[in-house]
C-alpha cells in the first residue's frame, strides 16, 4: 500500500492497530431481518480471533451437516471481534440445542429461523469501532478527520485482498506470465481477485496523483450514489452540471474492475490500463465479469473521540470497502503481530 497515493498527504503520526482484538470491532449489516420461520436455522455469532469459514464449518459439524449446507454473507477479519450471521439448512428438523456448542472465542448471541440461504455477498455493509492506540490529538490529525468526513478516502483494496505478503498477487502475476498453472478453484478465485484489485488500485492512485480524484472528465463512468447504476459522461449532459452533482455527493466517479468485455472510461483510464496488459489478458481469458467500483468512498455516521490511550473511530461502510483504507489516510499503521 505504501506506493499508492494519499488523497491528503502522507500522515505525520504513527498508531498501533489491533493491539487487542477489542480494538477492532465489526458488526455486520445484512440489510434485512430474519423471517423467523423456514428451513434454515440462522445464528448471530460473536467471534474473537476466529476464522469465519472455520466457525461456519464447526457449526455445521455440530448439527451433523456438510459445510455445503452452511451459509454466511462475508468473511470477517480474524484479528478482531466480529458479529455476523450464519445459516444451516435443516428442513423439517427440530431446533438444535446450541447451548452445548463450545468453541473458544465464539459466542452465539441469537438463534432463529430464516426462509432463504444467507449467500456470500448478500449484505449491505459493516459497522466499525476502531481504537488507534498512541494516536495523539493534534491539529494535523483533526484536519484529516474532518477531510475524511467531508471528502471521503481512496476506496483502495487493502492487504487482506492480496494475501499474506502479497502472495496472491505474486501468484497472479506468475500465472499471467505463464510461469505456473492454477487448477484449484479456490486459488484461481483468490489470484484473479488480487489481479483485478491491483489494477483498480493503480488506476485510482494515478488519478489522485494527477489531481483528478474529484474532477469529472469526458467519458468518465459515473455511479448514482447509493445505487449500482452507471452512466457515461458522453456529452449528453454538461460536464459542469455533472461536476456539481459530484460535489453534492449525488454522483461518484468510478474505476474499472477489469473483466472479459470491459467498457473503459476516459482517455486517462485507457492509458493506465494499457500498462498492465498481462494481468488484463489473464482476467479476460478467465472470463471475469466486468464491473465498476467507486473511486472514493465516504463513511456514514463517521464519529471520533480522542481518549487517554488513542483515537476511537466509529463509522459504517458499504460491503466491499475496507476500514483500513480509511485508517491509512489518518495515520501510519503499526499492526500488532
Swiss-Prot record:
A GO molecular-function annotation: tRNA pseudouridine(13) synthase activity
Superkingdom of origin organism: Bacteria
Active site: 77 (nucleophile)
Alphabetized InterPro entries for the sequence: PsdUridine_synth_cat_dom_sf (IPR020103), PsdUridine_synth_TruD (IPR001656), PsdUridine_synth_TruD_CS (IPR020119), PsdUridine_synth_TruD_insert (IPR011760), TruD_catalytic (IPR042214), TruD_insert_sf (IPR043165), TruD_pseudoU_synthase (IPR050170)
Swiss-Prot/TrEMBL keywords: Isomerase, tRNA processing
GO BP terms in the entry: tRNA pseudouridine synthesis
Function: Responsible for synthesis of pseudouridine from uracil-13 in transfer RNAs.
Sequence similarity: Belongs to the pseudouridine synthase TruD family.
Protein name per the record: tRNA pseudouridine synthase D
Organism the protein comes from: Mannheimia succiniciproducens (strain KCTC 0769BP / MBEL55E)
Gene coding for it: truD
